[in-house]
Structure formats: structure tokens, C-alpha cells
């Protein structure tokens, strides 16, 4: 294969065709198509995989349809806490931020952590202050708010109270989460991955999922694969899902497709994990597996027509 390629996702979960209007479908497909086409053009122009995934996730953060940046979900306290990670498969350098509320684009803050600090992961106020010191503007958390996300919070609160009072059953996690991500292989053979999220609706303040954790929700290594995950974050952390794909390929000799099948369809469900991931290997092969009802996704090789999807086809 050995071609430049990009894949993106806008989250996985209980995305039922029957609950989606044709107009809603078109909005998601258009947004995914425009963003992946932008990445394809960058790859054609010779941009690095790292720059391509960073820009793709920045655009996803700017789109209110997805749970990252503008349109991020609310915590139980009615606040926003955002997480992001980037990783360069060529150098194995990575940067991440978690629990930030005053940075418009967490993925750009994560990139700054990687390139301008000696650290990999920074959290909360310290991460924000570092980003501000590097020239990022401080923004009001209100910019992330949308009416649809607030309605989700109210519904989750009501369901949570009812479950707590009567059945003790947890909320359906697949309906509360979402993430965005991108993986790419550039024409020089370098891989990169980026992931960003607002977390879970009605999550406890301070909760951090897999998205900003290297090896759990985001991983890239030129020797094997670039991966960005979406789903039940706690299970992705416990299984080191993103790194597990790389390990199965590098040490177990599995193909990209077989490694993804093992992790997404076997290991994650065994622990109650729902969701999916996008991955591209060192040869440019692409995989977009998910075990949930749907996953917003798109991918395309440089110079080709992109492919988009929402449901299990």
C-alpha cells in the first residue's frame, strides 16, 4: 500500500439509524467529509502526519456536532472539562492535557506540551497556565456550551436520580460519551495520532478517561500503527486498548485487521467495553472497527475520494 492516508472519527456509541433524521445524517456526513478532505489535501501537499492529525482534530473541536471543544458535554456540576492527546510515531514523543476549561482547542495545548515542555501530560489549571504562557488565549467555558448538550445533561441527571432511587442500575454509558480523533500516515512513512474529548455527560468533576492517556486512547509508532479510540474510557484504560493494537502487531505478528478484531470485538466486550477505534499501520492499511451501534467516521488516501460512515453497514 505505502500511501499517504488519513482517518477520522467523531465518536462511537448508541447511534441508531431510527433515531436520526435525514437532515441530521447529512450534517454529520458533510462535516466528516469536509474535515477528512482537508486532511487529504494537506497530505498531498507533503504536510507531516503530525500536522495533519492536529489540524483534523482542531477542526473537529470547532464543530458543535461532536463532543470535543465547542459542543463538549457537561460534568455533573454543569461545567466543562476537556482532554486531548497527540503522539508522533516517528519520535514517540507525545503531549496531552486533561481537565482544561479555558482553552479553545485542547489538541493545540497538547501539541504545545509535547513540543515546548519536558512533560507528556499536564492537567487542570497548570496545563492552562502553560498553554497561556505559550501564547494561547484564555476563553470563557461558555464557548463550549450548546443547548443540545445541556438537554443531555438534564436527561442524564434525571435518569441517574431515578436509577439511584429505584434500580441501582448505572446509566447507559454508550449514550453519554463521545470523542473525536484522527490518525494519518504521510508520504514519508511517518504515523501520528490525536484524540480529543469533553468526556462523559454527567461525569464527576475531575474524571479523566482514556483520550489523553498515551497507550489507552491514543498511540502512534512508525514501527507498527497509529490509533485513536472512542468509547467506554475506563475499559480502554484498563486494557491499554490503543497500545494493545500495536503490541499484537509488533510482538504477536498479527495484521492490523486481526489486532483490531481481537481488541475491539473480544477484549473490550469481555470487560463491558463499548466503542471503537480508527487505525492506520506503517504500510497505510486502514481499520475502523467498532462494537457499538455506530461510529462517526471517514477516511481517504491522498488523491482519492473519501469514504464516510455512521452506522454498521
Swiss-Prot record:
Signal peptide: none annotated. Autocleaved. Generates the alpha and beta subunits. The beta subunit is thought to be responsible for the nucleophile hydrolase activity. Its EC number is 3.4.19.5. GO terms for molecular function: asparaginase activity; beta-aspartyl-peptidase activity. The active site is at 179 (nucleophile). The keyword Hydrolase applies. Pfam families: Asparaginase_2. It comes from the Bacteria. GO terms for biological process: proteolysis. The keyword Cell membrane does not apply. Gene3D superfamilies: (Glycosyl)asparaginase. Substrate binds at residues 207-210, 230-233. The record marks 178-179 as: Cleavage. InterPro entries: Ntn_hydrolases_N, Peptidase_T2. Degrades proteins damaged by L-isoaspartyl residue formation (also known as beta-Asp residues). Degrades L-isoaspartyl-containing di- and tripeptides. Acts best on iso-Asp-Leu, followed by iso-Asp-Ala, -His and to a lesser extent iso-Asp-Lys, -Phe and iso-Asp-Leu-Ala. Does not act on internal iso-Asp bonds (Als-iso-Asp-Leu-Ala). Does not act on alpha-Asp bonds. Has poor L-asparaginase activity. Heterotetramer of two alpha and two beta chains arranged as a dimer of alpha/beta heterodimers. This is Isoaspartyl peptidase.
